[in-house]
Amino acid sequence: MHGSAAPSSRTLLVGSGKIAARLAPQFLENGEVYALRRSDSPPPAGAIGIRADLAAPLAARLPAVDRMLVTLPPGDTPAAYRTALTHLAAALPAIPARTVFVSSTGVFDGSGSARPITERDQPGPTSMRSRGLLDGERAAVEIFDATIVRPAGIYGPGREYLLRTVRAGVAVEHARRTNRIHETDLVRTLEMLLRMPEPPRLLHAVDESPAPLGDVVTFIARELGVAVPPDIASAEPGGFVYDGTLVRSMLGRLDYPTYREGYAAMIAGSAA
């Protein structure tokens, strides 16, 4: 009599948004995937759904897993992430061998800086949101020994805020420093961090081309064939510049190395 083979790996996706939905198939190829979410919406195809609200202790135990990706939205208080992660750890039978916690470059706030920010720079958060993000990072490291990923300006199909802004002709601060990463490259980054033997402990997920917002909206406007949005002039440009050397050394060439390739593909896709 032959028993069914045990799965080679078990992956838990905490917060099942678009990123998790794109990652699930990669890990279903050689194991089971669990998708924990607060709502009762269906999990990614093939994944096992778990409905739970991490704002409170979980009523049932979670399955043992080998790896875990945490992509949770900001909470209402600076302690929301720590609370959620504490409840998550209490419901797991053991700490996973690998945890990746998705934070944001939003841990850096304030007036901004033209000097490239690397993973060695320490955030000095001033807002409730940025303080909550930083405390979430610290909790993820303390509780799960997690790798921290800080994406900047995630964009791609379905993430079209800037395209809508340009189409509507809404004024923007042209001199503002901006950074971004295409969703496809972020998914690649997260998959590699979940799989590689010795991942970096902290990673800024940004593309190769930090740029003034005016350059980006001008490119988009020309691709769309519309007027460039008006400028909101400012005495001191805001925003930061993030150094993406580490993520590029890990991934090699990005699928969308700059905003030009990314937005051109989005515009071409929407016109098809």
Segments (PLM) and residue ranges:
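Conserved Rossmann-fold NAD(P)-dependent oxidoreductase catalytic core, especially the SDR/UDP-sugar
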Residues: 87-126
